[in-house]
């Protein structure tokens, strides 16, 4: 079976009057809520049909990028909807394209996982 390597990204939401991040484990589809803490950011993409089951709606897909030379600042790239990505392959392609277009930037505290190519968002 072939596998593809994807990056983890944040989904931003407001919970309990403070910024929080909804972490979605793509492998087991378990939702974990975590408050923003320093530079510790970790998340993966969620499937569209799971959006309605989250405690709060998450309207924007936010890629958190950190300039390599200035750790104190970050750049947010918003996509109107997760359904913008028709498949896991297009999602990976978009991330790869972004890394080429913005070489000085890197994903903040990026983590990686392997998923079957047959998976879809």
Swiss-Prot record:
Keywords: Membrane, Transmembrane, Transmembrane helix. It is found in: Membrane. The chain crosses the membrane at residues 26-46, 57-77, 90-110. One of its GO terms (cellular component) is membrane. It is a multi-pass membrane protein. It comes from the Eukaryota. Partially overlaps VPS64. This is Putative uncharacterized membrane protein YDR199W. It comes from Saccharomyces cerevisiae (strain ATCC 204508 / S288c) (Baker's yeast).
């Amino acid at each position: 079976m072939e596998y593809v390597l994807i990056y983890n990204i944040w989904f931003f939401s407001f919970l309990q009057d403070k910024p929080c991040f909804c972490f979605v484990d793509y492998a087991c589809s378990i939702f974990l809520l975590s408050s923003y803490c320093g530079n510790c950011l970790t998340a993966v993409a969620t499937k569209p049909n799971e959006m309605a089951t989250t405690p709060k709606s998450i309207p924007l897909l936010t890629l958190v990028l950190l300039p390599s030379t200035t750790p104190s600042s970050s750049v947010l790239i918003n996509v109107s909807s997760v359904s913008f990505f028709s498949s896991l392959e297009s999602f990976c392609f978009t991330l790869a394209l972004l890394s080429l277009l913005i070489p000085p930037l890197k994903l903040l505290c990026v983590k990686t996982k392997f998923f079957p190519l047959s998976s879809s968002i």
